[in-house]
Regions:
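A cross-kingdom feature that marks ATP-driven nucleic-acid transaction machinery
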Residues: 1-124
Length: 124
């Protein structure tokens, strides 16, 4: 029996792992001393999937449309002043920049492309 992975509840975990592997490969190749970690509030109410040094906070969402609720962890991270840029990697079809919050929403292909090219907003 064929089952489409996009229809599985586990797809979000697979998707987050895929983004992690790309980040880890990139950092190992270009910035071997850079650290990647998870950020979470003291009580665990909010978290951000990946924090790359003091440069980048990344939330990964397998959703086809990122909603305001998906941004809660990034908003809290911004309040802490830990990173310079905030990003959501998603399954959305187009890039968006939420200017009022200075958060970029990337389709995963665009994010991976910009990451490896070392050009674009991520690198400004």
């Amino acid at each position: 029996m064929y089952v489409d992975l996009l229809d599985r509840a586990e797809f979000g975990v697979f998707f987050e792992h895929f983004v992690f592997l790309e980040l880890r490969a990139f950092l190992d190749y270009f910035e071997p001393r850079s650290e990647i970690g998870l950020w979470r509030t003291q009580k665990g109410e909010f978290e951000v999937d990946f924090v790359v040094g003091r440069r980048l906070g990344i939330e990964v969402k397998a959703a086809g449309r990122v909603t305001p609720r998906h941004l809660d962890g990034l908003r809290k991270l911004r309040e802490e002043g830990i990173v310079a840029k905030l990003v959501v990697v998603s399954c959305e079809p187009h890039c968006r920049h939420l200017e009022e919050e200075n958060i970029r929403i990337y389709p995963w292909r665009n994010f991976i492309s910009e990451l490896w090219s070392r050009r674009g907003w991520l690198w400004e």
